[in-house]
UniProtKB/Swiss-Prot annotation:
This is Somatotropin. Disulfide bonds join 78-189, 206-214. It comes from Felis catus. One of its GO terms (biological process) is growth hormone receptor signaling pathway. The keyword Metal-binding applies. The gene is GH1. Zn(2+) binds at residues 45, 198. Residues 1-26 form the signal peptide. Keywords: Disulfide bond, Hormone, Metal-binding, Phosphoprotein, Secreted, Signal, Zinc. It holds the Pfam family Hormone_1. InterPro entries: 4_helix_cytokine-like_core (IPR009079), Somatotropin (IPR034975), Somatotropin/Prolactin (IPR001400), Somatotropin_CS (IPR018116). Belongs to the somatotropin/prolactin family.
Length: 216
């Protein structure tokens, strides 16, 4: 392996292991670039985990002939579709960093309850062999986004919560067709919401710190 890619992998692993600053002023401030790098890496990891789990669940439980029709029916299922959040990179670029951070936080917080039931659904899953840690990973990303908000907010009052609903918990009765469809829909929303959060964070990072990886 060439030195460049190997060093990049080692740097990414090191950043994932870094803790977030707990209180502003308690410890030397982490550079804003590092806060963004940490948040983006965590969001990418969670989005990939969600995408892999969705595909694995689909292969295991959803007949191939039914997938397209079910996916179309899921289009209006996600609670996050009811908030005025950007739907893609171009729309995200029209919003301020503080707005994007608030939307990211709302998306992450809406899953903190449901994912606590995820390990019961995927007890034998190859992807979710460590599924009991998904909640901790989401909490870690939540803390990172909150750290960025503390750095970027100018002291103006925060806007009210836009999304007060959370998602239903995952159903552990996998012998029920209704439960399978419910879990399939939830996993689809989980994947979509984490993709949005990752996109928002990458847009913010790229426009603040111009870099070659901004094309996505």
């Amino acid at each position: 392996m060439a030195a460049g890619p190997r060093n990049s992998v080692l740097l990414a692993f090191a950043l994932l292991c870094l803790p977030w600053p707990q209180e502003v002023g308690t410890f030397p401030a982490m550079p804003l670039s590092s806060l963004f790098a940490n948040a983006v890496l965590r969001a990418q990891h969670l989005h990939q985990l969600a995408a892999d789990t969705y595909k694995e669940f689909e292969r295991a439980y959803i007949p191939e002939g039914q997938r397209y029709s079910i996916q179309n029916a899921q289009a209006a299922f996600c609670f996050s579709e009811t908030i005025p959040a950007p739907t893609g990179k171009d729309e995200a670029q029209q919003r301020s960093d503080v707005e994007l951070l608030r939307f990211s936080l709302l998306l992450i917080q809406s899953w903190l309850g449901p994912v606590q039931f995820l390990s019961r659904v995927f007890t034998n899953s190859l992807v979710f062999g460590t599924s009991d840690r998904v909640y901790e990973k989401l909490k870690d990303l939540e803390e990172g986004i909150q750290a960025l908000m503390r750095e970027l907010e100018d002291g103006s009052p925060r806007g009210g919560q836009i999304l007060k609903q959370t998602y239903d918990k995952f159903d552990t009765n996998l012998r029920s067709d209704d439960a399978l469809l419910k879990n399939y829909g939830l996993l689809s929303c989980f994947k979509k919401d984490l993709h949005k959060a990752e996109t928002y964070l990458r847009v913010m990072k790229c426009r603040r710190f111009v870099e070659s990886s901004c094309a996505f």
